[in-house]
Amino acid sequence: MYTARRKIQKDKGLEPTEFEDTVAQAFFDLENGNQELKSDLKDLYINGAVQMDLPGNRKAVIIYVPYRLRKAYKKIHVRLVRELEKKFSGKDVVLVATRRIVRPPKKGSAVVRPRTRTLTAVHDGILEDVVYPAEIVGKRVRYHLDGRKIMKIFLDPKERNNTEYKLDTFSSVYRRLCGKDVVFDYPMTETA
């Protein structure tokens, strides 16, 4: 029997939470009810989901998708997020690929750590996932005298209409996932 439970696959031995079940049910309903997404969603599933509070009495839904399926999710990202935001009544939906950070190898060991498993690569990948479909066109790091570090991320101005209202959501979600302060902006376009 094909049920919503097949839409979520957790690590061995872990049961999905109640909220994860509702997200899996939403995926299942979209697959069965929405004709344009049906064929695309057939083989896709999620690893987990978390709901978080945002400043200003808003909520965001972070959905973790398998790293290997991220390209398939990116093909339907805009339509899928629009439908999920309707289902979750205005909550901002963010899709993030599940990535692992591996500790650096000990001195003298012959083990080589893949570049994709380093802390920097994982945090950069999460940042790209959070702001998708907009592309990052520039980064600046600002160091305060007290040691704080704030990253300023410039997004592609072509996606301004789709992403401008979500910039606060992006920075809150990234701070929750990576613990880094981030400010999103669009580069100034010169009019000649």
Swiss-Prot record:
Q: Which Pfam families match?
A: Ribosomal_S7e
Q: Give one GO term, molecular function aspect.
A: structural constituent of ribosome
Record's InterPro entries? Answer: Ribosomal_eS7 (IPR000554), Ribosomal_eS7_CS (IPR047861)
Q: Which PROSITE patterns would you find in this protein's record? A: RIBOSOMAL_S7E
What processes in GO biological process is this protein linked to?
Answer: ribosomal small subunit biogenesis; rRNA processing; translation
What cellular-component terms does GO give this entry? cytosolic small ribosomal subunit; small-subunit processome
Q: What UniProt keywords apply to this chain's record, in alphabetical order?
A: Ribonucleoprotein, Ribosomal protein
Give the family this protein belongs to, as stated in its UniProt record: Belongs to the eukaryotic ribosomal protein eS7 family.
Full protein name: Small ribosomal subunit protein eS7
Query: What organism is the protein native to?
Result: Oryza sativa subsp. japonica (Rice)
The coding gene here is RPS7
